[in-house]
């Protein structure tokens, strides 16, 4: 049983904790919280011991929460650490704490790529993480792009270049201090956005350029992709690649999927925790072939898409299971859509 310590219990950390707890080959030995808020109390109710920094003990005790120990104690109690801290805090934790202990650490995409030995996506480069000390699961948008491109590559569809245009959600649903509210913001105004170079930390030979804007929504990101293929392929061949690839969902307008809100409503109707949708939601009707050019649109649920990647990263780093067995195990335990998917 792999003992997993989780540093940070926010949007990503709490989802990873729940996902790890659903596996039969790993368990959560504790989560690190900085603030004794409602999330800390929910973590306790879920059976996760709460750790914090030594100078925060009194605040937790006053809130009725008895800390199980310090961050150092949590690291010592763990076989592997998932760092789900806010952007740039992971690097600080590495320099201040992780380097003192011989424990592997998995960072998130908010950190720069050089915080880790390898950037990770389960479909694309699972094997590269084996035995690595520091691994970084790439961001939500990078994960979405990498999945889509890898689904083509795995099914023998060559890619000459990819141009991806991203409409980023302005904030997560709970982020009351972020925006925009009534604006469309170049994010950034320069080209490329960081997503293209980030994809290249995994798919190193891919010719890719990305552009991004931030829009006043909270539910999901939307990507609009132009992909030049290495040869002429039929639309059916491309659709079949998406159908077979795990963690990709094809949304049909005729079935009621007319917007990203319908994807989230579908997640709610499935009874998924927190209305999560870790799959990339490709609008089937948008998939268009013109010669060797492929066009498509797809949604990325920023709060949950990286969760299965973190579970697989744990097994990849520790060499517990080979790639496809881990991906299938994760998908089934998290109750992702597995019908028609090919694992191997």
UniProtKB/Swiss-Prot annotation:
An MF annotation (GO) of this entry: NADP binding
Enzymatic reactions: D-glyceraldehyde 3-phosphate + phosphate + NADP(+) = (2R)-3-phospho-glyceroyl phosphate + NADPH + H(+); D-glyceraldehyde 3-phosphate + phosphate + NAD(+) = (2R)-3-phospho-glyceroyl phosphate + NADH + H(+)
Pfam families: DapB_N, Gp_dh_C
SUPFAM superfamilies with a match to the protein in the record: Glyceraldehyde-3-phosphate dehydrogenase-like, C-terminal domain, NAD(P)-binding Rossmann-fold domains
GO cellular component, one term: cytoplasm
Entries under PROSITE patterns matching the protein: GAPDH
Keywords for the protein's UniProt record, in alphabetical order: Cytoplasm, Glycolysis, NAD, NADP, Oxidoreductase
Binding site for NAD(+): 11-12, 110, 169, 302
Record-linked InterPro entries: DapB_N (IPR000846), GlycerAld/Erythrose_P_DH (IPR020831), GlycerAld_3-P_DH_AS (IPR020830), GlycerAld_3-P_DH_cat (IPR020829), GlycerAld_3-P_DH_NAD(P)-bd (IPR020828), Glyceraldehyde-3-P_DH_2_arc (IPR006436), NAD(P)-bd_dom_sf (IPR036291)
Residue numbers annotated as active site: 140
GO biological process, one term: lysine biosynthetic process via diaminopimelate
UniProt signal peptide: none
Gene3D superfamilies in alphabetical order: Dihydrodipicolinate Reductase, domain 2, NAD(P)-binding Rossmann-like Domain
Pathway assigned in UniProt: Carbohydrate degradation; glycolysis; pyruvate from D-glyceraldehyde 3-phosphate: step 1/5
Tree of life domain: Archaea
Primary subcellular site in the record, as a coarse category: cytoplasm
Residues noted as binding D-glyceraldehyde 3-phosphate in the record, renumbered to the chain: 139-141, 195-196
Subcellular locations according to the entry: Cytoplasm
EC number: 1.2.1.59
Assembly: Homotetramer.
Family: Belongs to the glyceraldehyde-3-phosphate dehydrogenase family.
Protein name: Glyceraldehyde-3-phosphate dehydrogenase
Organism: Pyrobaculum islandicum (strain DSM 4184 / JCM 9189 / GEO3)
